[in-house]
Structures are given as C-alpha cells and as structure tokens.
Amino acid sequence: MSTPSAAPACVIGHIAVRDQAKWVEYRDQVAATLAPFGGEVLFRGRKARVLGGAHDAELTVVIRFPSLDAAHGWFDSPAYQRLIPLRMAAADVDLVSFSG
C-alpha cells in the first residue's frame, strides 16, 4: 500500500479577485514555480452555479502534483513564497492541499 506522500496530490484554490492587473501579473508567474515540483494546472475556471451550500469565490484552480510532499515543497519554495505578497494584493485566495 502506498504511503500518503507517494499518492498524487492536488492543491485547490478558491479565488476572489480584487485587482485584475495584479492578479494577471501573479497568475502569469506561477507556472514557472510549479514545474520544478511536477505541478500542472488541471483546471482553471469561473463559478457556474453553486449546487449546494455557499461558495463566494468567483474562480477555482486545481493543481496536480505527484505527491503531497511535492505540493508542500512548491508552496514552501522561495520562488513561490516571493509571489505571495503579490497574490495577497491581487485577491482573496483560499488554498488547500489534498492527497489521494
């Protein structure tokens, strides 16, 4: 049986953009930070309809990594950490990692 860190993992982001220009600047720089950790954007889209509960974010992104360790390595990397102030100025973002 695989250990949790060996299972594929995803980072899911729920995003409410406050400054479109800063958001585009941030978004355009993220891809380069994903590659060293095997990350790839699986889905990026706008909210179509809430089917149950509440969901205020307008955008959702799903990023796949080969493992939870890789996902956390990406988030903790100096390259991504440098982008966080720009992300915080651009949008309200909830990021959650999942393994499985």
PLM regions and their residue ranges:
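C-terminal structural segments of small proteins and small subunits
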Residues: L68-V96
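Short S/T/G/P-rich N-terminal loop/turn motif that feeds into the first structured element of a domain
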Residues: M1-L59, P66-D76, S99-G100
